[in-house]
């Protein structure tokens, strides 16, 4: 087979084996890429946008049409657009991570090392199911990722010295739960806090000697800064929507030392 024929063969065969996966938010991409670096991942809610309010553009909807799998994380975006996604691509396999929310309506499960282990296993099984020829590669990367998460858990329990922290939106609920911490969120049911509630939080924070207020750049900073100033706490800006959730967890551990 001459060189030109080989090129033509590659052009027409490579797309047949290309894996295209769609996810709701950026942290899901980080997990998938840790296990399958060569997979193309379409993120429906781009960085800097809220999963509660974002609407997908034409390019993203087109990517859905070419995707074999959609990983749903359970945020408001999914509830609004999953039916539309099924209409665009009736053959797409949808994996619902939201079903693992057993006792809480808080969807921010991707910052829990315990959940990330579960997510990684579901991703692994799904990838092997649709592309069994790369099973060994996926398994090897999966084991590395699980070890990384296990080391993070050890690091967190060893280095975190604070018992509680304040944030605006309850993005870090499952992180706090995993490490036996108390997260005090200023936002209640999606609404800004009243002055009465702010005063209550300030009183609690002083009583419990809370030293850290964590601000997520995707949400208003005003109220968190007011509380931080009143209690003399340090302010840490940490996004819950970074691509690699293990790095976000490392940032949180460092902030709470």
Predicted features along the sequence, with ranges:
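Hydrophobic alpha-helical membrane-insertion segments
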Residues: 1-3
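Extracytoplasmic metal-acquisition and chelation regions
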Residues: 19-257
């Amino acid at each position: 087979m001459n060189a030109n024929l080989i090129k033509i063969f590659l052009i027409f065969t490579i797309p047949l084996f290309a894996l295209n996966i769609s996810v709701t938010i950026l942290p899901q991409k980080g997990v998938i890429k840790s296990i399958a670096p060569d997979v193309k991942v379409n993120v429906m809610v781009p960085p800097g946008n809220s999963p509660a309010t974002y609407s997908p553009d034409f390019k993203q909807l087109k990517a859905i049409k070419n995707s074999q799998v959609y990983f749903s994380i359970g945020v408001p975006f999914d509830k609004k657009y999953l039916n539309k996604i099924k209409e665009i691509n009736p053959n797409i396999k949808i994996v619902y991570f939201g079903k693992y929310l057993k006792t809480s309506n808080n969807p921010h499960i991707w910052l829990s090392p315990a959940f990330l282990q579960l997510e990684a296993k579901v991703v692994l099984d799904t990838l092997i199911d649709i592309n069994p020829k790369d099973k060994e590669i996926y398994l090897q990367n999966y084991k590395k990722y699980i070890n990384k998460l296990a080391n993070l858990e050890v690091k967190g329990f060893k280095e975190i010295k604070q018992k509680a922290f304040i944030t605006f939106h309850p993005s870090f609920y499952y992180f706090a739960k995993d490490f036996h911490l108390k997260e005090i969120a200023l936002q209640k049911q999606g609404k800004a806090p009243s002055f009465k509630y702010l005063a209550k939080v300030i009183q609690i924070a002083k009583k419990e000697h809370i030293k850290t207020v964590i601000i997520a750049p995707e949400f208003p900073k005003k109220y968190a800064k007011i509380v931080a100033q009143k209690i003399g706490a340090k302010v840490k800006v940490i996004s819950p929507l970074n691509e690699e959730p293990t790095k976000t967890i490392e940032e949180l551990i460092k902030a709470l030392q």
